[in-house]
UniProtKB/Swiss-Prot annotation:
Protein name: Metal tolerance protein 3
High-level lineage: Eukaryota, Viridiplantae, Streptophyta, Embryophyta, Tracheophyta
Annotated PANTHER family: METAL TOLERANCE PROTEIN 3, MITOCHONDRIAL METAL TRANSPORTER 1-RELATED
Basic and acidic residues composition-biased segments: 40-58
Side Vacuolar, residues: 136-140, 206-221, 276-284
Purpose of the protein: Involved in sequestration of excess metal in the cytoplasm into vacuoles to maintain metal homeostasis.
Stretches of the chain found on the membrane's Cytoplasmic side: 1-114, 162-184, 243-258, 304-410
Domain of life: Eukaryota
Length: 410
């Protein structure tokens, strides 16, 4: 391809056709990658090797790329990487057996529960020490950090209760399980933390308005302050490092809280010391900064988890993965009609419509649809999949979602 021709789709049709690109079933990720690299402009071609995975193409070696061009090529490479992952999943024996999956899930669950218990025990111990530090120093910033630890203890209990609730299974009362409890618990947790921020903000502003300096700390009080706050910071940092590697969303909430505590401890300590040594108002100003940070940080967490409960569409790369998986699933699939994926808690619900031959026997069609459903549900991002089998794709949508929505007419 000419180095200046930027209009030909790199993954599109032959001969610079302006028709929309059509992906053929016989096309493999390797052939698509080779075609992609062969059509790269000269200034980019040095960063690619047809025998290497798409993810290994180094665009940093390409010279003269604008930011927009770089983003475009990165998106194309990401698409090829998705196709390669799907083809790897479709290889015989690539999916783990049910026994292996259960063993892995059991191991991850034990690790998650261990992280939760350690975090809760640490929160209790740190709360006791911070209460003592607050009484000894009388610092507003330290008091804000202590209130944060109190809510850590309460909210940690909520998260752990949420985890235990998810473990109890009753297929008659909750046919699809209780995974939705997870984002609900995180929302409650985050809402409590944001409420703490408002309370601390009000108290700090009141102290600033009163314009009254507190008493200076004694050397003994400073020693207690340094010892407790620095110890708490080190413990919280270690817990953050321990929890952040978990794939469990509840443990991730713990990790975020531990990181938040590291920030509040450091800012609270600095504000308390500077307020004692220099200007008294530094202490309440530090508390105001912590309060604003708390409100913004945890309000964002509330929004992120609330969105997962209202059926937000999956990102385009997820839809591409599902479409490619459905297309590569079986040569008897004539067409992939519809692919939908939307959040329903922490994971996605997936709907796929495929077209088969009108003359195909019911048992054969059922086997194709069921095996595709099994493949999709083994993806780590998917909770449930629904595969609809049809013999044509010109019909109207089966579901009447809009009829349930409020009228937009005034």
């Amino acid at each position: 391809m000419d180095g200046d021709d930027r209009r030909t789709p790199l993954l599109g049709g032959e001969g610079g056709s302006t028709r929309p690109p059509s992906l053929r079933r016989r096309d493999s990720a390797r052939s698509l990658r080779s075609t992609f690299l062969s059509r790269l402009p000269d200034k980019v071609r040095g960063g690619g090797d047809p025998e290497r995975p798409a993810a290994d193409v180094d665009l940093t070696r390409a010279k003269g790329l604008s930011q927009g061009e770089k983003e475009y090529y990165e998106k194309q490479l990401a698409t090829l990487k998705i196709f390669e992952e799907v083809e790897a999943l479709c290889m015989p024996g690539e999916f783990e057996s049910d026994a292996e999956v259960l063993e892995l899930e059991d191991k991850e669950q034990k690790q998650s529960e261990s992280a939760m218990k350690i975090s809760n025990y640490a929160n209790i111990i740190l709360l006791v020490f911070k209460v003592y530090a607050t009484i000894k120093t009388g610092s507003m910033a330290i008091a804000a950090s202590t209130l944060d630890s109190l809510l850590d203890f309460l909210a940690g209990g909520i998260l752990y209760f949420t985890h235990l609730t998810m473990k109890s299974v009753n297929i008659y009362k909750y046919p699809i399980g209780k995974l939705r409890v997870q984002p609900v618990g995180i929302i409650v947790f985050a809402a409590i933390m944001a409420t703490l921020g408002f309370q601390v903000l009000i108290q700090a502003i009141e102290q600033l308005v009163e314009n009254k300096a507190g008493e200076k700390m004694t050397p003994e009080q400073l020693i207690w302050l340094y010892s407790i706050m620095l110890s708490a910071t080190v413990v919280k940092l270690a817990l953050y490092i321990y929890c952040r590697s978990s794939g469990n969303s509840i443990v991730q909430a713990y990790a975020k809280d531990h990181y938040f505590d590291v920030v509040t401890n450091v800012v609270g300590l600095v504000a308390a010391v500077l307020g004692d040594k220099f200007f008294w108002w530094i202490d309440p100003v530090g508390a105001v900064l912590l309060a604003v940070y708390t409100i913004v940080n945890w309000s964002g967490t509330v929004y992120e988890n609330a969105v997962t409960l209202v059926g937000q569409c999956a990102p385009s790369d997820m839809l591409q993965k599902l479409t490619y998986l459905a297309m590569k699933h079986d040569p008897r699939v004539r067409r992939v009609d519809t692919v939908r994926a939307y959040s329903f808690g922490a994971l996605y619900f997936v709907e796929v419509d495929i077209e088969l031959s009108e003359d195909m026997r019911l048992g054969e069609a059922h086997s194709i649809g069921e095996s595709l459903q099994d493949k999709i549900e083994k993806l780590p991002e998917v909770e449930r999949a629904f595969v609809h089998v049809d013999f044509e794709s010109t019909h109207k949508p089966e579901h009447r979602v809009r009829s349930r929505l409020p009228s937009t007419e005034p």
